[in-house]
Each structure stands twice: as C-alpha cells, then as structure tokens.
Amino acid sequence: MIFGIDVASMLLGGVAAGMVLFIVSVGLSVTMGLMGFVNLAHGGFAMLGGYAIALAMKHWGLGFVPALVFGFVVTAAASAVLERLLYARLYRATELDQVLFTIGLVFMMIASVTLLIGPENQPLALPAILQGQINLGITQYRTYSVVLIVVGIVIVSGLWLGFERTQIGAQIRAAVDNRRMAESLGINIARLFTITFAFGSGMAALGGGLGAEFLGLDPQYALKYLVYFLIVVAVGGLGRVTGVFYAALLIGVLDFVLKKYVPQGGTAFIYVLTILLLLWRPQGLFGAKVT
C-alpha cells in the first residue's frame, strides 16, 4: 500500500511538472514549426513573464489570476514588437545567425533582470486556496499540483479546439504544413507570424508564472530549462499541440522518477534517450513523417 501511494505521488508530481513543460513549450513548437526559426530566447520570455507576474503580485497587489493575465498580455505585446522589429529581419537568415541572435537576446534578458532586480530567486506567493493538500482517495497531494494538472488539461483542450475549429487555427496548420501553398491561398503570413509568436511567448510567460513553484524563478531560468523545452518540442514534433502535450507528460514523469531514484544521472539519461529517439525518428514521436 505504501509503495502504491509512493508511485501515485511520483506520477502526480511528474504529471504536474509535465504540465508546466507543456504550457511553456507549446508556443515554441508552433512558432518553430510555422516560422522555421530557431528561437533560443523562448525561455527568456518565460522568465520575463514569470517576473512580470511575481512583481505585479508583490508590488501592485494583483491577485494570482489577474497577475497571470497581466504577465501573458505584457509578454505577448512585448514579443510582438520584437518580432516585427528584430525577428522578422532574420527569417531568411541562416540557422547559425538565428541561434547567435536569440542566444545573445537571452544574455541581454538575463543581464537586464540581474541588474534591475537582482540574481536572487523571485518568490511567487500562492493564494491560500491553492495551498495545503487535497484528499485524492489513495493519497494526500498538494492542492496546487492538482489544480495545475486541471489547468493544463483545460489549456490543451482549448488549444486543440482553437487549432482544429477556428479559421486562424486552420491558417496556422496550413502554413506549418506548406507555407508556399498557404501564401498562394491569400493567407497573410507576416500577420500570422506576429500573432503566433505573440501568443506563443504569452504562453511561455504563463508557464513561467505557473511553474515558479516547481522550477523556481531567477534570471538564469532563461537558460537553465531551455534544453528541456527543446527536448519536449523535438519529441513532440514541430507544430503538434497534442504531440507536445504527450511529450511533456512523458518527460515530466520520467524526469521526476529518475531524479528520485538516480539523482546523479537522471538528466543525462533523458538526454541520451532523446538522442537515440531522434536518430530513430528525426521528426519526433508524434511529428509527421518526413518524406
């Protein structure tokens, strides 16, 4: 019985961590699939959004949910401006140029936050209703983790419906599958790029705030978890919302279990598995087969 409770707790913890990975990574998957742009600054938008949420709660007295909305909107708006002013100039550049630009942008984000706020971890105070534990029958588990799982399910359901049942979702899917054909059908690709990039960055900000309780929130966040976000995208497939969801859950649970039983080598094991997977299926587990 004790073993069953321990397994259930680990699975719940891994699923909750996977939800955070999904919320942050889904925007990166869609923007990379749509734009073909290697955006290593995505973790930076998650970090900046998390800071916006934490500071809005701490200094302006915003509640948790309004602060999440604030962080999403501010980050999405700022990223839309950056996309038009800077990113758009590099869409036809080499991948090396894109990598150098975005990694330089990350270093600027880290340096700016460190200078203005400091290098310390930024606490994010949860409301009382999300603290404590909830009875799940076989075990007691943190209320916030359970809520986070529910929020993740709601988000993936909403995104799936948005991509499958709305006009802009159809346009994004068409552009991801065949950009030239989408352009020939009259789809405004530049406008679509800006909207998608802003939304993806806003989702990263939301994940940065929601996941601060698990991952912490400091200036190095922008680089610290970047590899995990890229792994989720690689395993889930570019532009695949449900693929990223399943990949995030898989990586979240695997990471949680391995760090408990193999704390010194768990992360390295995930890296090795990812390399082997991509050698076998370069498009990822859930990506469309490359022809």
Short names for language-model regions:
Residues 89-90, 94-165, 192, 262-264, ...:
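Transmembrane helix-bundle core of multi-pass membrane transporters
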Residues 21, 25, 61-73, 194-274, ...:
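Transmembrane alpha-helical segments in multi-pass inner-membrane proteins
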Residues 1-23, 52, 64-67, 93-99, ...:
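Membrane-interfacial amphipathic/re-entrant helices at transmembrane-helix boundaries
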Residues 61-106, 112, 246-251, 281-282:
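Alpha-helical transmembrane segments within multi-pass membrane transporters and channels
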Residues 12, 34-81, 85:
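Membrane-embedded helix boundary and interhelical linker motif in transport proteins
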Residues 50, 54, 72-78, 105-114, ...:
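Hydrophobic core segments of alpha-helical transmembrane domains in multi-pass membrane transport
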Residues 17, 139-217, 241-246:
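Helix-loop-helix "hairpin" substructures at the membrane interface of multi-pass membrane proteins
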